[in-house]
Amino acid sequence: MASIVPRFRCLNAPPLRQTSRNILAIPTATSRSFATEIDVSKPTPIVKRRPTYFKDKINAVPSFSEFVGLPEKAFTPEDALELRTAMVGPPGKKRQITRLPEWLKTPIPDNSNYKKIKKDLRGLNLHTVCEEARCPNISDCWGGSDKSAATATIMLMGDTCTRGCRFCSVKTSKAPPPLDPHEPEHTAEALSRWGLGYVVLTSVDRDDLADGGARHFAETIMKIKQKKSSILVEALTGDYGGDLEMVKLVAESGLDVYAHNMETTEELTPFVRDRRAKYRQSLKVLEAAKKAKPSLITKTSIMLGLGETEEALWQALRDLREVDVDVVTFGQYMRPTKRHMKVEEYVTPEVFEIWRQRALDLGFLYCASGPLVRSSYKAGEAFIENVLKKRKGVTILSDEATGMDKAIV
């Protein structure tokens, strides 16, 4: 028979409340310890935080006192190159870019005259090559405090070109929108509203049209002259696919300056311009314009920094003089987007001045040459304007208006 444990044995244990009091009454002098004793003779190693990139940069250079006491050393070519380049892009995909030289940096346009011209253009649904081609001189040409000094090169026949030159940022399409029949009238209205004395008209190439847009161009010039006959008009045209009759039509429409850009040397033309634009064809356009109206000033522009050679540039200037071109401009090619040709060289202002003098020595009437000079740069226009007025028997207002000082940027 199983033994029975007496239940009353638990009555001999102290009450639970009393037990808790006894525990609380135990002196606290005793200290808790880990089950495994720690050897305090060995110091605990300190884990250093990974230094940041900023701290690395700070620690890599001398202190201020050390820096002041360092002897001056000339920059090595490697140091100079490092200052001209920068690494951009996300981690793992960084690439090296070349910073723009100081002489190519321009202010951001933001003043009342710039805003007014832009508002007028939008209201009349007009386009400018200044915006479409991302011209660096837009703050200078649009932002002048003197209204008569402001220049905006109106781009006719829309903002979409049928050609795709590798240096130009204008939109391209095989089938651009149809021409706006009201554009000639709107253009004449805008130019008369601004009160300018000298205007520049250009256009996209329209190979989709039978006449290349020559009649539209000529109509616009005639409308401008009807509104204000004293306005001097420069037309920067395409090559009309080599149709010299269309060149003659525009040249005889009443303009004062016929411009067509060569863009580069003969050897680089196939790599820089659209395959339909040919070096010899452009020379024939300038020659045909001069023959159609000998009193016209003919003008062209060449970009530097594309990898051209000195001898090729000399040959281009000689070719232009053979067809009696009066004015040439030199400017720095600046890559508009990553889709376009890379800049081979940033040409210094001193080299631009050398080519300006060489052009004048060859017999050109005028040459504007500088990193920021473009084919319709206002410094050149001021000089041409006074040449035209002089031919018409108008007194030149001032020596400053010739723009000779502004020609070299």
Curated annotation (Swiss-Prot):
Its EC number is 2.8.1.8. Residues 1-34 form a transit peptide. Its cofactor is [4Fe-4S] cluster. Pfam families: LIAS_N, Radical_SAM. InterPro entries: Aldolase_TIM, Elp3/MiaA/NifB-like_rSAM, LIAS_N, Lipoyl_synth, rSAM. It catalyses: [[Fe-S] cluster scaffold protein carrying a second [4Fe-4S](2+) cluster] + N(6)-octanoyl-L-lysyl-[protein] + 2 oxidized [2Fe-2S]-[ferredoxin] + 2 S-adenosyl-L-methionine + 4 H(+) = [[Fe-S] cluster scaffold protein] + N(6)-[(R)-dihydrolipoyl]-L-lysyl-[protein] + 4 Fe(3+) + 2 hydrogen sulfide + 2 5'-deoxyadenosine + 2 L-methionine + 2 reduced [2Fe-2S]-[ferredoxin]. Its main location: mitochondrion. One of its GO terms (biological process) is lipoate biosynthetic process. [4Fe-4S] cluster 1 binds at residues 130, 135, 141, 376. SMART domains: Elp3 (SM00729). GO terms for cellular component: mitochondrion. Binds 2 [4Fe-4S] clusters per subunit. One cluster is coordinated with 3 cysteines and an exchangeable S-adenosyl-L-methionine. It is found in: Mitochondrion. [4Fe-4S] cluster 2 binds at residues 161, 165, 168. GO terms for molecular function: 4 iron, 4 sulfur cluster binding; lipoate synthase activity; metal ion binding. Pathway: Protein modification; protein lipoylation via endogenous pathway; protein N(6)-(lipoyl)lysine from octanoyl-[acyl-carrier-protein]: step 2/2. It comes from the Eukaryota. Residues 144-365 form the Radical SAM core domain. PANTHER family: LIPOYL SYNTHASE, LIPOYL SYNTHASE, MITOCHONDRIAL. Belongs to the radical SAM superfamily. Lipoyl synthase family. This is Lipoyl synthase, mitochondrial. It comes from Sclerotinia sclerotiorum (strain ATCC 18683 / 1980 / Ss-1).
